[in-house]
Amino acid sequence: MKILIIDDDLLMVEAQTALLTQAGHEVLSSTHSGKAIELIRAHIPDCVITDIIMPEVDGIQILKQISDDKQLTGIKVIIVSAKPFKFDRRQAMKMGAAGFITKPIDPATYCAQIQCAITEKIKLTFWGVRGTLPVPGKRAFKYGGNTSCVTLELPKGEFFIFDAGSGIKELSNHIMATRDGKLNAKIFISHPHWDHINALPFFSPLYIPGNEFEILGTSHAGISMESLITAQMDDVYFPITMHQLESSVYFRDLTQGEYDVDGVNVKTFLLNHPGNSLGYRINYNGRSICYITDNEFFLPDSPNYDLDYINRLSEFIEDTDALITDCTYLDNEYPSKVGWGHSCVSQVAAVAHQANVKNLYLFHHDPDQDDAKIDLKLADAKMALEKLGSKTVVSAPTETQSFLI
């Protein structure tokens, strides 16, 4: 891919050039923004990477010139700037930028960010895959021991976090190391059981001025999402209250329905779990990701088996590119856990097949399961799908593992 870098900082140009060249791209560059359009017309790159603040012509002007020129249609423009303000990001995206990356860049993730913006891929990352309770020690060496936390990084900079189990501390470490803690994000809570909210107070970006978060989820037993989250940070339980956070934090109560979140279509579905628990479907540019945890599919011979519910949920997740779902138990473990609000392998595989799911990610593993048990669960899921003649691809993600959707 041919990429043109426009930045008046020579060191930044050299750093980005080295990374992109190593990744196999053809790279051109200039530190003179006044010559940008001349260079673009002469070379017709696939992508232009530009800073905003430059002494001759700023990056937003370059973006506008490209957008207004019909001969330059198809060139992707990515902003790489030290400006952290939402206004600049919104303005750039509104004018057609393919992505917005905030300096300083992280050499470990920079090329992947550029690739995601160019191809409009969604980056899905697992920060905690366990359920109920964190699992420290060698039993969890392969898959990790942290509880529920998953992120979606969308091509235009939207950052969605799903649940705040202990995995959110691993995410926190990553954000502090790669972004200097700077983050504006949406935090979707499935439900307020401990393994989905209790590590939120340890998410360091919440304490950084200038950051902005919206926490979204359903009320529970008539208690709003704001009250649920605030209560666990009451000074009886935790030394720092919600009112002491230095970031801006907002709350939104959701029910089953359809929402616009940062311009992204989000659908919600009430799940079969004690109390209110929401599943989420994110629809973006012809692709979708479903986050369905915690949820119980009763077996067909159970008096609680609800075919109508299964069909409605199957319709909700139908044809999704990625289904992240509760698969807490092996089939032989499930009979002693009926009614606990979690599912076993065979039923998860059957519903994924029924819904024509493209990729199935097993999630929310029981704390008593070691890595070998999760390996067995994955093998059982593959066998079940094979018997059904399914095209669904199944995997059991490990902690910090990422996928491009």
Set out the residue ranges of the language-model regions.
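C-terminal output helix
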Residues: 105-114
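The feature encodes the CheY-like receiver
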Residues: 13, 55-56, 73, 85, ...
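Charged docking surfaces used in two-component/phosphorelay signaling
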Residues: 14-22
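Binuclear metal-dependent hydrolase catalytic cores
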Residues: 120-293, 298-303, 313-314, 371-405
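Cap/insert and terminal regions of metallo-dependent hydrolase folds
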Residues: 298-391
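Short hydrophobic/Thr-rich beta-strand motif most characteristic of the beta2 strand and flanking loop
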Residues: 24-31, 39
